[in-house]
Amino acid sequence: MFIDKAKIYLKAGKGGDGAVAFRREIYVPAGGPAGGDGGKGGNIIFQVDEGMRTLMDFRYQKHYSAENGEDGKNRNMYGKDGTDLVLKVPPGTIVREENTGEIIADLTGSEDQVVVARGGKGGKGNSHFKSSVRQAPRFAIAGERGQELTVVLELKLIADVGLVGFPNVGKSTLLSVVTSAKPKIANYHFTTLTPNLGVVRTKFGDSFVLADIPGLIEGAHEGTGLGHEFLRHVERTKLLIHVLDVAGLEGRDPLEDFEKINQELHLYNEKLAEKPQVVAANKTDIPGAEDNLEKLKAVLSERGIEVFPISAATSQGLDELLSYVSKRLKELEEIEALKADTAPKEEKVYKYEETEDKYHFTVTRENDVYIVEGRFIERLINSTNFDDIDSLSYFQKVLRNRGVIDRLKEAGISEGDLVKMYSVEFEYFN
């Protein structure tokens, strides 16, 4: 089955904690602090793999974590950085942030890669906190947590050629005949619910990827039927084969069908309607198809659209159709290559930023308890040794400098009131 959406949870590596250590070499009785910094947490990186065609792997594993950084060591030795986790995705994958729907990355090129979740910074060792009044600091800073987020992966199908047309016009039959793909085929609407891919090899040895894209009906641009799913898959094909039932077996006019589908493409995205098209006039082996075929040719030839009479059931006319499509693809690829050579090169860089300030915190009151929360508060709590006077002094200094004490006063705190910061509770005294 072709999977084109997946939701996964990402957790980048935590930074290693800074070390509390002291020089203990012989003949150095008061060597001072020597705690090294923690290593950086591993990033989570998405990288294009041209050999992949689906998001199937992400269906079975939903949680991904990068390696944590190592803690700092004695003798001012840094901890080792955590190893990055590289996740391979097919070309054409879009990464969205689940809550906002914001596009984080659009991975199309063969060498595209992007850091989606950044590892936390390593904490500072106690050697950073030595001063004229603090000769032997007994505290260090904990490493930062890595970024955590849930993302939705969406694969915009990358096929060279897409088969479009109303349900039951013979797209699935055509795909099964010209490729080794085995789509479900039956005589009812929306038999094809997900795209089927196949590789076409012409009699001249050329090849291209062909996709039988789920059928659509009027109102598809508004989401009717399989509309939005269908239209999303069309976007990145280079060329469309518009399959029409010229026998009119369901009582429809093939020319009207052609106009209706192109109208849906235009309403969804004007660029879709501008894609090069070739018409495969299917079911010409059925009596009565000839009149519709001549009418179709007369109208579309004036618009410069090639019409190929075929029968997917008997393989009539398929060689001519596929040879033309292969030739047209080469022309389009040459045009794209020329544009790429002349266009200014632009380096794609994505950096996932925190939505809130690094030192953001909140003060709330529940009954007689003042609760202070924030990422920097949590990190400060984790890195404070409350049994050490120097560490406690540094803790109080940070709260004062970052405005926490002022905010508590604004909230109405009084002498002796209880303050809670995660796992720590203490009474407030000015």
From Swiss-Prot:
GTP binds at residues 165-172, 190-194, 212-215, 282-285, 311-313. It holds the Pfam family MMR_HSR1. Its cofactor is Mg(2+). One of its GO terms (molecular function) is GTP binding. Its EC number is 3.6.5.-. It is an enzyme of class 3 (hydrolase). InterPro entries: G_OBG, GTP-bd, GTP-bd_Obg/CgtA, GTP-bd_prot_GTP1/OBG_C_sf, GTP1-OBG_CS, GTP1_OBG_dom, GTP1_OBG_dom_sf, OBG_GTPase. Mg(2+) binds at residues 172, 192. GO terms for cellular component: cytoplasm. Residues 351-430 form the OCT domain. Residues 1-158 form the Obg domain. Residues 159-330 form the OBG-type G domain. It is found in: Cytoplasm. Keywords: Cytoplasm, GTP-binding, Hydrolase, Magnesium, Metal-binding, Nucleotide-binding. One of its GO terms (biological process) is ribosome biogenesis. HAMAP family: GTPase_Obg (MF_01454). An essential GTPase which binds GTP, GDP and possibly (p)ppGpp with moderate affinity, with high nucleotide exchange rates and a fairly low GTP hydrolysis rate. Plays a role in control of the cell cycle, stress response, ribosome biogenesis and in those bacteria that undergo differentiation, in morphogenesis control. Monomer. Belongs to the TRAFAC class OBG-HflX-like GTPase superfamily. OBG GTPase family. This is GTPase Obg. The lineage of its organism: Bacteria, Bacillati, Bacillota, Clostridia, Peptostreptococcales.
